[in-house]
Amino acid sequence: MKLVPRFRKQWFAYLTVLCLALAAAVSFGVPAKAAENPQTSVSNTGKEADATKNQTSKADQVSAPYEGTGKTSKSLYGGQTELEKNIQTLQPSSIIGTDERTRISSTTSFPYRATVQLSIKYPNTSSTYGCTGFLVNPNTVVTAGHCVYSQDHGWASTITAAPGRNGSSYPYGTYSGTMFYSVKGWTESKDTNYDYGAIKLNGSPGNTVGWYGYRTTNSSSPVGLSSSVTGFPCDKTFGTMWSDTKPIRSAETYKLTYTTDTYGCQSGSPVYRNYSDTGQTAIAIHTNGGSSYNLGTRVTNDVFNNIQYWANQ
Protein backbone atom coordinates (compact mmCIF):
# COMPACT_ATOMS: atom_id res chain seq x y z
CA MET A 1 0.00 0.00 0.00
CA LYS A 2 1.40 3.36 -1.00
CA LEU A 3 0.71 6.23 1.41
CA VAL A 4 0.40 9.81 0.32
CA PRO A 5 2.76 12.17 2.23
CA ARG A 6 0.08 13.54 4.59
CA PHE A 7 -1.13 10.09 5.68
CA ARG A 8 2.44 8.77 5.85
CA LYS A 9 3.27 11.37 8.54
CA GLN A 10 0.10 10.54 10.47
CA TRP A 11 0.84 6.81 10.29
CA PHE A 12 4.41 7.34 11.54
CA ALA A 13 3.17 9.48 14.45
CA TYR A 14 0.64 6.79 15.37
CA LEU A 15 3.30 4.07 15.44
CA THR A 16 5.60 6.23 17.57
CA VAL A 17 2.89 6.82 20.17
CA LEU A 18 1.99 3.12 20.17
CA CYS A 19 5.61 2.04 20.78
CA LEU A 20 6.04 4.52 23.61
CA ALA A 21 2.83 3.32 25.22
CA LEU A 22 3.93 -0.31 25.02
CA ALA A 23 7.32 0.54 26.53
CA ALA A 24 5.67 2.40 29.38
CA ALA A 25 3.32 -0.51 30.02
CA VAL A 26 6.23 -2.91 30.25
CA SER A 27 8.36 -0.70 32.50
CA PHE A 28 5.54 0.19 34.88
CA GLY A 29 3.86 -3.20 34.82
CA VAL A 30 6.93 -5.23 35.85
CA PRO A 31 8.84 -4.05 38.93
CA ALA A 32 12.56 -3.62 38.34
CA LYS A 33 14.71 -6.19 40.13
CA ALA A 34 17.02 -4.66 42.72
CA ALA A 35 20.71 -5.15 42.11
CA GLU A 36 22.11 -7.97 44.23
CA ASN A 37 24.60 -6.98 46.91
CA PRO A 38 27.91 -8.81 46.28
CA GLN A 39 28.67 -8.50 50.01
CA THR A 40 25.64 -10.60 50.97
CA SER A 41 26.79 -13.35 53.32
CA VAL A 42 26.18 -16.95 52.21
CA SER A 43 26.91 -20.25 53.95
CA ASN A 44 27.35 -23.87 52.90
CA THR A 45 23.87 -24.56 54.33
CA GLY A 46 22.28 -21.97 52.03
CA LYS A 47 21.69 -19.31 54.68
CA GLU A 48 21.93 -15.73 53.40
CA ALA A 49 22.21 -12.47 55.33
CA ASP A 50 23.01 -8.84 54.60
CA ALA A 51 25.28 -7.64 57.39
CA THR A 52 26.40 -4.48 55.58
CA LYS A 53 25.40 -1.13 57.04
CA ASN A 54 26.01 1.39 54.23
CA GLN A 55 28.67 3.09 56.31
CA THR A 56 30.45 6.07 54.81
CA SER A 57 32.34 7.22 57.91
CA LYS A 58 36.10 7.52 57.54
CA ALA A 59 36.60 6.54 61.16
CA ASP A 60 38.19 3.11 61.52
CA GLN A 61 36.24 0.15 62.80
CA VAL A 62 38.39 -1.95 65.12
CA SER A 63 38.04 -5.37 66.73
CA ALA A 64 40.75 -5.89 69.34
CA PRO A 65 43.05 -8.92 69.56
CA TYR A 66 43.20 -11.28 72.53
CA GLU A 67 46.34 -13.15 73.56
CA GLY A 68 44.63 -16.12 75.24
CA THR A 69 46.16 -18.24 77.98
CA GLY A 70 48.70 -20.02 75.77
CA LYS A 71 48.31 -23.27 77.70
CA THR A 72 48.99 -26.44 75.72
CA SER A 73 47.30 -28.98 78.01
CA LYS A 74 45.65 -31.72 75.96
CA SER A 75 42.47 -31.30 77.97
CA LEU A 76 41.95 -27.94 76.27
CA TYR A 77 41.55 -29.13 72.71
CA GLY A 78 39.30 -31.32 70.62
CA GLY A 79 41.77 -34.04 69.61
CA GLN A 80 44.61 -34.50 67.16
CA THR A 81 44.50 -35.59 63.53
CA GLU A 82 47.58 -36.08 61.37
CA LEU A 83 47.01 -33.85 58.36
CA GLU A 84 47.88 -35.38 55.00
CA LYS A 85 51.29 -34.73 53.49
CA ASN A 86 50.29 -34.78 49.80
CA ILE A 87 48.51 -31.48 50.18
CA GLN A 88 47.73 -29.35 47.11
CA THR A 89 47.73 -25.58 46.71
CA LEU A 90 44.68 -23.64 45.53
CA GLN A 91 46.08 -20.30 44.38
CA PRO A 92 49.56 -19.19 43.27
CA SER A 93 51.57 -16.78 45.36
CA SER A 94 54.94 -15.30 44.61
CA ILE A 95 58.46 -14.96 45.88
CA ILE A 96 59.39 -11.41 44.89
CA GLY A 97 63.10 -11.46 44.14
CA THR A 98 65.07 -13.14 46.94
CA ASP A 99 63.05 -15.37 49.28
CA GLU A 100 63.14 -13.51 52.60
CA ARG A 101 60.67 -15.63 54.54
CA THR A 102 61.82 -16.84 57.94
CA ARG A 103 60.60 -19.90 59.79
CA ILE A 104 58.58 -19.34 62.96
CA SER A 105 59.86 -21.90 65.45
CA SER A 106 58.05 -20.46 68.48
CA THR A 107 54.56 -21.23 67.17
CA THR A 108 53.17 -21.24 70.72
CA SER A 109 53.95 -17.51 71.04
CA PHE A 110 51.30 -14.92 70.25
CA PRO A 111 50.14 -14.11 67.59
CA TYR A 112 51.61 -17.17 65.85
CA ARG A 113 49.56 -19.63 67.90
CA ALA A 114 46.40 -17.94 66.56
CA THR A 115 47.54 -18.71 62.99
CA VAL A 116 45.84 -21.84 61.68
CA GLN A 117 46.83 -24.46 59.11
CA LEU A 118 43.82 -25.65 57.10
CA SER A 119 43.49 -29.05 55.42
CA ILE A 120 40.55 -29.00 53.01
CA LYS A 121 38.59 -31.58 51.04
CA TYR A 122 35.99 -30.84 48.37
CA PRO A 123 33.30 -33.00 46.74
CA ASN A 124 34.20 -35.04 43.64
CA THR A 125 37.96 -35.00 44.22
CA SER A 126 40.27 -37.20 46.27
CA SER A 127 42.87 -34.45 46.69
CA THR A 128 43.49 -32.57 49.91
CA TYR A 129 44.17 -28.84 49.61
CA GLY A 130 46.01 -26.49 51.93
CA CYS A 131 45.26 -22.98 53.13
CA THR A 132 45.97 -20.79 56.13
CA GLY A 133 43.56 -18.94 58.38
CA PHE A 134 43.56 -16.86 61.55
CA LEU A 135 41.30 -16.86 64.58
CA VAL A 136 39.23 -13.72 65.27
CA ASN A 137 37.28 -15.02 68.27
CA PRO A 138 37.12 -18.29 70.27
CA ASN A 139 35.74 -20.41 67.41
CA THR A 140 35.89 -18.43 64.15
CA VAL A 141 38.70 -18.65 61.59
CA VAL A 142 38.91 -16.06 58.80
CA THR A 143 40.47 -17.21 55.52
CA ALA A 144 40.31 -16.66 51.76
CA GLY A 145 36.97 -17.24 50.07
CA HIS A 146 38.48 -19.74 47.63
CA CYS A 147 39.50 -21.93 50.58
CA VAL A 148 35.91 -22.47 51.74
CA TYR A 149 34.32 -22.29 48.28
CA SER A 150 36.17 -23.61 45.23
CA GLN A 151 35.08 -22.41 41.80
CA ASP A 152 35.79 -25.94 40.53
CA HIS A 153 34.26 -28.03 43.32
CA GLY A 154 31.85 -25.80 45.27
CA TRP A 155 31.69 -25.67 49.06
CA ALA A 156 34.32 -27.58 51.01
CA SER A 157 33.08 -30.89 52.40
CA THR A 158 35.52 -31.00 55.34
CA ILE A 159 38.07 -28.59 56.80
CA THR A 160 40.51 -29.54 59.56
CA ALA A 161 42.16 -26.69 61.46
CA ALA A 162 45.45 -26.87 63.40
CA PRO A 163 46.27 -23.69 65.39
CA GLY A 164 49.96 -23.01 65.93
CA ARG A 165 51.10 -26.16 64.16
CA ASN A 166 54.87 -26.73 64.08
CA GLY A 167 55.74 -29.50 61.62
CA SER A 168 54.65 -32.79 63.21
CA SER A 169 53.77 -31.03 66.48
CA TYR A 170 50.17 -29.99 67.22
CA PRO A 171 50.49 -27.98 70.45
CA TYR A 172 46.76 -27.15 70.45
CA GLY A 173 45.40 -30.16 68.59
CA THR A 174 43.06 -30.04 65.61
CA TYR A 175 39.46 -28.97 65.10
CA SER A 176 36.80 -29.60 62.48
CA GLY A 177 34.88 -26.94 60.60
CA THR A 178 31.13 -27.05 61.23
CA MET A 179 29.99 -24.13 59.05
CA PHE A 180 31.57 -22.28 56.13
CA TYR A 181 30.86 -18.70 55.03
CA SER A 182 31.70 -16.40 52.13
CA VAL A 183 29.86 -13.73 50.11
CA LYS A 184 27.90 -13.80 46.85
CA GLY A 185 30.47 -11.68 45.06
CA TRP A 186 32.78 -14.69 45.33
CA THR A 187 30.49 -17.75 45.27
CA GLU A 188 28.22 -16.51 42.46
CA SER A 189 30.20 -13.89 40.54
CA LYS A 190 33.74 -15.31 40.96
CA ASP A 191 34.93 -11.76 41.60
CA THR A 192 38.31 -11.79 43.33
CA ASN A 193 37.47 -8.46 45.00
CA TYR A 194 35.24 -10.51 47.32
CA ASP A 195 37.61 -13.41 47.95
CA TYR A 196 37.21 -13.90 51.69
CA GLY A 197 35.33 -16.19 54.05
CA ALA A 198 35.24 -17.85 57.45
CA ILE A 199 35.00 -21.19 59.22
CA LYS A 200 33.18 -22.02 62.45
CA LEU A 201 34.92 -24.71 64.53
CA ASN A 202 33.65 -27.54 66.72
CA GLY A 203 35.49 -26.11 69.70
CA SER A 204 36.90 -22.85 71.05
CA PRO A 205 40.69 -22.86 70.69
CA GLY A 206 40.72 -19.06 70.70
CA ASN A 207 40.18 -19.05 74.45
CA THR A 208 43.60 -20.67 74.70
CA VAL A 209 45.58 -19.47 71.67
CA GLY A 210 43.93 -16.05 71.47
CA TRP A 211 42.96 -14.30 68.27
CA TYR A 212 44.01 -11.53 65.92
CA GLY A 213 42.36 -8.16 65.91
CA TYR A 214 41.10 -6.77 62.61
CA ARG A 215 40.39 -3.24 61.48
CA THR A 216 39.57 -1.00 58.55
CA THR A 217 42.10 1.51 57.22
CA ASN A 218 39.71 4.35 56.39
CA SER A 219 41.25 7.14 58.43
CA SER A 220 44.67 7.05 56.75
CA SER A 221 46.27 5.15 53.90
CA PRO A 222 48.07 1.92 54.86
CA VAL A 223 50.57 2.40 52.02
CA GLY A 224 54.09 2.24 53.39
CA LEU A 225 53.08 0.59 56.66
CA SER A 226 55.28 -2.37 57.58
CA SER A 227 53.04 -5.46 57.60
CA SER A 228 53.58 -9.20 57.98
CA VAL A 229 52.09 -12.22 56.21
CA THR A 230 52.36 -15.42 58.27
CA GLY A 231 51.19 -18.85 57.19
CA PHE A 232 51.91 -22.44 56.18
CA PRO A 233 53.43 -22.53 52.67
CA CYS A 234 53.51 -25.80 50.75
CA ASP A 235 57.05 -25.37 49.41
CA LYS A 236 58.60 -25.70 52.88
CA THR A 237 58.81 -28.63 55.31
CA PHE A 238 55.24 -29.82 55.66
CA GLY A 239 53.28 -28.11 58.42
CA THR A 240 55.89 -25.48 59.26
CA MET A 241 55.04 -21.80 59.73
CA TRP A 242 56.80 -19.02 57.84
CA SER A 243 56.57 -15.23 57.81
CA ASP A 244 57.83 -12.17 55.95
CA THR A 245 57.46 -8.46 56.68
CA LYS A 246 57.50 -5.61 54.17
CA PRO A 247 55.65 -2.31 53.55
CA ILE A 248 52.22 -2.19 51.91
CA ARG A 249 52.84 -1.32 48.25
CA SER A 250 49.42 0.05 47.21
CA ALA A 251 45.89 0.37 48.53
CA GLU A 252 42.94 -0.15 46.20
CA THR A 253 39.25 -0.09 47.10
CA TYR A 254 39.05 -3.84 47.67
CA LYS A 255 42.70 -4.95 47.69
CA LEU A 256 46.05 -4.26 49.30
CA THR A 257 49.23 -5.18 47.43
CA TYR A 258 52.66 -5.93 48.88
CA THR A 259 55.99 -7.47 47.93
CA THR A 260 55.96 -9.68 51.01
CA ASP A 261 57.10 -13.18 50.01
CA THR A 262 54.42 -15.87 50.09
CA TYR A 263 53.74 -19.24 48.47
CA GLY A 264 50.87 -21.62 47.74
CA CYS A 265 48.88 -22.79 50.79
CA GLN A 266 49.32 -19.36 52.40
CA SER A 267 45.95 -18.22 51.03
CA GLY A 268 43.94 -16.91 53.96
CA SER A 269 46.97 -15.75 55.93
CA PRO A 270 46.55 -12.56 57.94
CA VAL A 271 48.14 -9.42 56.54
CA TYR A 272 48.76 -7.69 59.86
CA ARG A 273 50.84 -5.28 61.88
CA ASN A 274 51.41 -4.45 65.52
CA TYR A 275 49.40 -1.26 66.04
CA SER A 276 50.29 0.85 69.06
CA ASP A 277 46.62 1.16 70.07
CA THR A 278 45.31 -2.32 69.26
CA GLY A 279 48.27 -4.72 69.02
CA GLN A 280 48.45 -7.52 66.42
CA THR A 281 45.71 -6.57 63.97
CA ALA A 282 44.85 -7.79 60.45
CA ILE A 283 44.15 -5.23 57.73
CA ALA A 284 43.77 -7.71 54.84
CA ILE A 285 43.41 -11.41 54.03
CA HIS A 286 46.09 -12.82 51.72
CA THR A 287 44.61 -14.36 48.56
CA ASN A 288 47.04 -14.68 45.65
CA GLY A 289 50.09 -13.31 43.90
CA GLY A 290 51.68 -12.22 40.66
CA SER A 291 55.14 -11.73 39.25
CA SER A 292 55.85 -8.42 40.96
CA TYR A 293 53.53 -8.28 43.98
CA ASN A 294 51.09 -10.27 46.11
CA LEU A 295 47.52 -9.33 47.00
CA GLY A 296 45.06 -9.53 49.85
CA THR A 297 41.38 -8.70 50.30
CA ARG A 298 41.29 -5.41 52.18
CA VAL A 299 39.30 -5.16 55.43
CA THR A 300 36.73 -2.60 54.33
CA ASN A 301 33.62 -1.63 56.29
CA ASP A 302 31.65 -4.40 54.56
CA VAL A 303 34.34 -7.02 55.18
CA PHE A 304 34.57 -5.94 58.82
CA ASN A 305 30.81 -6.20 59.28
CA ASN A 306 30.64 -9.64 57.69
CA ILE A 307 33.47 -10.95 59.86
CA GLN A 308 31.64 -9.67 62.93
CA TYR A 309 28.41 -11.29 61.73
CA TRP A 310 30.13 -14.65 61.19
CA ALA A 311 31.89 -14.43 64.55
CA ASN A 312 28.52 -13.96 66.27
CA GLN A 313 26.85 -16.97 64.64
UniProtKB/Swiss-Prot annotation:
InterPro entries: Glutamyl_endopeptidase, Peptidase_S1_PA, Peptidase_S1_PA_chymotrypsin, Peptidase_S1B, Trypsin_dom, TRYPSIN_HIS, V8_his_AS, V8_ser_AS
Residues spanning the signal sequence: 1-34
Chief location bin: secreted
Compositional bias per record (Polar residues), positions renumbered to this chain: 37-60
PROSITE patterns reported for this sequence: V8_HIS (PS00672), V8_SER (PS00673)
GO cellular component labels: extracellular region
Region (Disordered): 35-74
Keywords: Disulfide bond, Hydrolase, Protease, Secreted, Serine protease, Signal, Zymogen
EC code(s) of this entry: 3.4.21.-
Pfam families given in the database record: Trypsin
Propeptide: 35-93
Record-level GO BP terms: proteolysis
Family, as annotated: Belongs to the peptidase S1B family.
Subunit structure, as described in the record: Monomer.
Protein name as catalogued: Extracellular metalloprotease
Gene coding for it: mpr
